A protein has these predicted regions:
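Carbohydrate-interacting/catalytic domains
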Residues: 74, 79, 83-203
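Conserved alpha/beta catalytic core and glycan-binding cleft of carbohydrate-active enzymes
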Residues: 1-92, 138-139, 146-148, 155, ...
């Protein structure tokens, strides 16, 4: 899925969530003209042919956010070897730096984040089989929904290094699936800097 590969890193570098969510709507939305609704495309943020995402992202604090989007958008997420540790690699006169021989790196915060995302993907069917709906968006904050017959999840993120509030048309009672905190939503959601939340609707 090269369209979303480009949309992912470009959206963060240009502070423009509209780019990637346009692609997600175009590919996986509910309208009859959407391209791949119900299909499972192979998604990635880097591979052996392109520069490592840790080298492309201008703000490394956004790495957990881009991986959250990779694992929660429709499709099959792929982690290129070494990127779970956040290693860098840029193209020079050849591609050697993109696929180096590496020793085992020490576990770090990004590795921990990716492991949690793998666990979420395996244990929440909506992330694998649910439909996709955009809930709210600004240039730097977004919420989208994954829903199947078992559950309804909202993926909520703020790419900015400052708090902000995202207003949208939607409400309900939710639980943060990481903290089990109850989160009542009434047409707005407040974000901390660089915050990602996955909320499960309970009523």
């Amino acid at each position: 899925n090269y369209e979303c590969y480009k949309g992912l890193y470009s959206s963060f570098n240009s502070a423009n969530f509209y780019e990637i969510l346009y692609s997600l709507n175009r590919q996986f939305g509910k309208d009859p003209w959407c391209l791949y609704t119900g299909k499972h495309l192979f998604n990635f943020v880097d591979n052996h042919d392109v520069e490592r995402v840790a080298s492309i992202l201008e703000d490394k604090n956004q790495l957990p956010l881009i991986y959250t989007m990779l694992f929660t958008m429709p499709g099959i997420p792929c982690i290129y070897y070494g990127s779970e540790w956040g290693i860098e690699g840029k193209k020079n006169w050849n591609d050697t730096d993109l696929r180096p021989e590496i020793k085992v790196f020490e576990w770090n915060e990004l590795t921990d984040t990716i492991q949690k995302l793998i666990h979420l993907k395996h244990n929440h069917s909506a992330l694998s089989y649910g439909d996709y709906t955009q809930i709210g968006i600004t240039n730097t904050a977004c919420i989208y929904q994954r829903q199947d017959e078992k559950e309804c999840l909202w993926i909520c993120m703020n790419m900015k290094n400052e708090a902000q509030t995202l207003g949208f048309n939607g409400q309900g009672n939710f639980i943060d699936i990481e903290t089990n905190e109850e989160v009542p939503v009434h047409n707005a959601l407040e974000f901390k800097p660089y915050e990602v939340r996955i909320l499960k609707k309970v009523s």
